[in-house]
């Protein structure tokens, strides 16, 4: 089935760009979400989150061939089909109307304006694309589609569940044919943060980076606090220049100068400033659902952040009916109770996306934990989960 972005691009190619002016005017009525960054440290962290590559051009340009891929193969229609997002606030909307942004060379023009969310490029004096790196926002920001599907205002902290990470990686020349087949099999909005170490493939749903304040460990398997995971990803996955050591998993990377560690406090401050988005729900049903939740779910979902992991608790996969394959690749071999924040805004659920809806989540636990819930109780519980 074609994506909303690809359908929009096809339609757009059939209309005169003068007609796009109507969309521009309409989009102008949609205000950009107000930034949550208020302190100097949070503002610094926002810039890091959005635009800092941590020097990873050393890998993506010098080794992986991302420049050639972007320069020769990925034009805007393909970029949107692959789930890349465009920040409309970086566009000159008058020129956007007057010039076809989906023409040959359009991707470079978007990169020159820092408009492709999560990609950072540098250009030569004659306009040639020299280097490309990636930022945190590539996977952990999306847009509100205010202009077109895939083009709108930034939503930092929202996971990009449209991003075809595996397909993009499979287009790079550094992988073997066997590896490319594995990468191409990853569902959109997923990524395996250990594939480059052990070659196994259990892709995880990209998690939200909002609502993290007060959460002790921000990974499905609770390896460490948010700055631990930020460092792990920045250095071992994004291939930034820095130092990361964890003897539990046999990683000892030392690169100087360290372009990651000094930035971790500001990055954490910005992520902690990102609130979980609110959803609509039925007040009466949610109130009844809270009673159901307290009686059946609050054994693990405890405290203000609704996770017993803040008390150091982890759960064997068999205890909650989770697929053990990913946990077995981690030091703890267990899963954390996921904090419940903005749930309705980031389906699918569980580490592997195996629950497509909140109803699926409830039915899963009702079966695994033998919860004797009526259909009405399940519906009320779903409304309560939407309220979190």
Predicted features and spans:
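N-terminal secretory signal peptides that target proteins for export/translocation
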Residues: 1-11
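N-terminal Sec-pathway targeting helices
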Residues: 11-14, 30-32
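Bacterial N-terminal signal peptides
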Residues: 15-26
């Amino acid at each position: 089935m074609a994506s909303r972005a690809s359908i929009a691009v096809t339609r757009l190619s059939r209309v005169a760009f003068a007609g796009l002016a109507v969309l521009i005017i309409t989009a102008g009525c949609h205000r950009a979400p107000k930034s949550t960054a208020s302190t100097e440290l949070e503002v610094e962290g926002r810039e890091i989150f959005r635009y800092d590559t941590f020097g990873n051009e050393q890998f993506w340009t010098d080794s992986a061939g991302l420049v050639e891929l972007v320069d020769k193969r990925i034009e805007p229609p393909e970029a949107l089909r692959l789930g890349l997002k465009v920040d409309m606030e970086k566009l000159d909307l008058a020129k956007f109307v007057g010039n076809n942004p989906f023409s040959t060379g359009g991707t470079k023009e978007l990169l020159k304006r820092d408009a492709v969310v999560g990609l950072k490029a540098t250009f030569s004096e004659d306009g040639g694309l020299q280097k490309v790196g990636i930022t945190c926002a590539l996977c952990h920001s999306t847009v509100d589609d205010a202009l077109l599907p895939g083009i709108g205002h930034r939503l930092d902290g929202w996971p990009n569940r449209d991003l075809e990470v595996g397909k993009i990686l499979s287009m790079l020349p550094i992988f073997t044919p066997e590896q490319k087949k594995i990468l191409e099999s990853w569902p959109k909005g997923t990524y395996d943060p250990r594939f480059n170490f052990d070659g196994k493939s259990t892709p995880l749903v990209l998690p939200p980076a909002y609502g993290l304040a007060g959460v002790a460990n921000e990974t499905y398997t609770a390896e460490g606090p948010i700055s631990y995971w930020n460092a792990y990803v920045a250095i071992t996955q994004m291939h930034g220049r820095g130092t990361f050591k964890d003897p539990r998993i046999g990683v000892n990377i030392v690169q100087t100068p360290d372009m990651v560690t000094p930035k971790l406090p500001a990055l954490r401050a910005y992520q902690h400033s990102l609130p979980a988005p609110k959803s609509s729900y039925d007040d009466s049903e949610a109130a009844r659902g809270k009673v159901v939740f307290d009686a059946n779910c609050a054994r693990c979902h405890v405290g203000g952040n609704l996770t017993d992991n803040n008390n150091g608790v982890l759960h064997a996969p068999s205890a909650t009916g989770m697929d053990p394959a990913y946990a077995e690749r981690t030091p703890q071999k267990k899963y954390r109770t996921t904090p419940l924040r903005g749930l309705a805004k980031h389906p699918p659920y569980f580490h592997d996306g195996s629950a497509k809806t909140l109803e699926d989540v409830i039915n899963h636990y009702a079966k695994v934990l033998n919860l004797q819930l009526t259909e009405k109780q399940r519906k009320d519980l779903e409304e309560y989960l939407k309220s979190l």
